[in-house]
Structures are given as C-alpha cells and as structure tokens.
Regions:
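E1/E1-like adenylate-forming module used to activate ubiquitin-like modifiers
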Residues: 99-151
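ADP-ribose/adenylate-binding Rossmann-like module
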Residues: 75-81, 86-112
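Short loop/edge segments at beta-strand edges and connector loops
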Residues: 42, 60-64, 104
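Glycine-rich, highly charged phosphate/nucleotide-binding loops
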Residues: 51-71
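Hydrophobic, well-ordered beta-alpha structural blocks that scaffold small-molecule cofactor pockets
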Residues: 1-44, 49-53
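An accessory alpha-helical subdomain
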Residues: 129-202
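Alpha-helix C-terminal capping/helix-to-coil transition sites in glycosyltransferase folds
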Residues: 12, 71-73
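Short beta-strand and adjoining strand-loop segment in the mid-core
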Residues: 35-39, 73-83, 121-130, 144
Length: 202
C-alpha cells in the first residue's frame, strides 16, 4: 500500500472492530488508548479482550458480523480469522465510504496502522510495505536513539512555542526558532544541552 502518512486526532472517533482474537485485541487497545469510542462485533472474545471490555466499558455485539453493523462507524477494522468475512466487511466499508484497516489483506483496506514510537510530544510511525514485523524491528532501532531525552527536550520546546504564541509573538517565534532547530539540533538534545538553550533563550 502506498499512501500519505497523517496523524489523526482519535479522541471521540467512532471505531468498529470486527473480530475477537489477538489482532482485534491489539487494534482495540490502540484505539481505546487514543481516546476512540470502540465497538466490537464477534461471536467470542479472547480473555485479554474481555478484560479490556470490562475495564473500558466497550460496547460488544456477541455474534457474527452483519452488514448493518457498520452503522455510524467512521473507521472499521476487519480482524476476523475468516477471509470471506473480512472481504465482505471491506466491500461494506467501501460502499459506505468508510476508512478500513484489513488486518489479513492490507490491499483490501484504505489505511494501514504503523509501528509507533512515542516519547512525549514526539511520535514516529514506521511502515514497511505490508511487513509488520519489519516495521516493528525498525521502530525498535529508532526507539533506542530517540529516547526520553527527546521527549523531555521537545516538551520544553513546545512549551516555549505556546508561551510565545500566547504572548502574541508568533512572528518572533518564526524568525528566531531556527536558531534552536538548527543543524546541531539532535546533537544538542543528545548532549542534554537543548533544554538549557531554551531556558536561556531571549
């Protein structure tokens, strides 16, 4: 799948996850943690997914998928162990112009979920052409470098930007911020110097 990476505000997003196994559990967790309103459809749920349902109060339809289940869902995850069912979900999602993640056959969907690394305001996503294990491996390598130092420094940088905007200094921020975000930016973070530079910034 070739596509355009975007960062979506998931809070309140209406998500339908069809399936009750390990993949459905992982997807439901990701969306729930992001603040989405997750609804499940599956005859049975894995124990871990049952626990998530109880902990988060997720809505569940304990039966096979039906076309009407799409309802008002804005985003759909097809994660059953039945290729025919997943293909049917894909057709229904396409007919309803909904976003679909097809867990077993990515080409049936119109969006894919990346292997994600987060540190404070920093979010990095990795896609590897439909090979999730490769994406995870690359993500883990990146995570070793882009550690808590980056999260802390970027938190300070974001706070500075917000303060300047609140003070009506948008133009000054745009003019002066390249002095902080220069060719030595990453080196300064890794040496623990960026936060000090921010604190001293006029």
């Amino acid at each position: 799948m070739s596509g355009l990476p975007i960062l979506v505000e998931a809070s309140g997003l209406r998500v339908l996850v069809v399936g009750g196994g390990a993949v459905a559990t992982r997807k439901a967790k990701q969306f729930t943690q992001a603040g989405a309103v997750v609804r499940l459809v599956a005859p049975t749920l894995d124990e871990e997914l049952e626990q998530l349902v109880l902990a988060r109060g997720l809505a569940v339809e304990r039966r096979p998928y039906e076309s009407t289940d799409i309802g008002d869902a804005q985003l759909i995850v097809a994660a059953t162990d039945d290729r025919i069912v997943n293909a049917g979900i894909a057709r229904d999602a396409d007919a309803g112009s909904r976003l679909l993640n097809a867990a077993d056959h990515s080409d049936d969907g119109n969006f894919a979920m990346m292997a994600v690394h987060r540190r404070g305001p920093l979010t990095m996503g990795v896609s590897a052409g439909g090979v999730p294990a490769a994406a995870v491996r690359i993500r883990d390598v990146l995570a070793e470098r882009f550690d808590a130092r980056y999260g802390d420094a970027l938190s300070d940088l974001c706070a500075l930007r917000k303060r300047m905007i609140a003070a009506g200094e948008v133009h000054r921020w745009r003019e002066k911020s390249p002095e902080l975000i220069d060719a030595e930016f990453c080196d300064a973070i890794e040496r623990g110097q960026l936060s000090a530079r921010i604190a001293e910034w006029p």
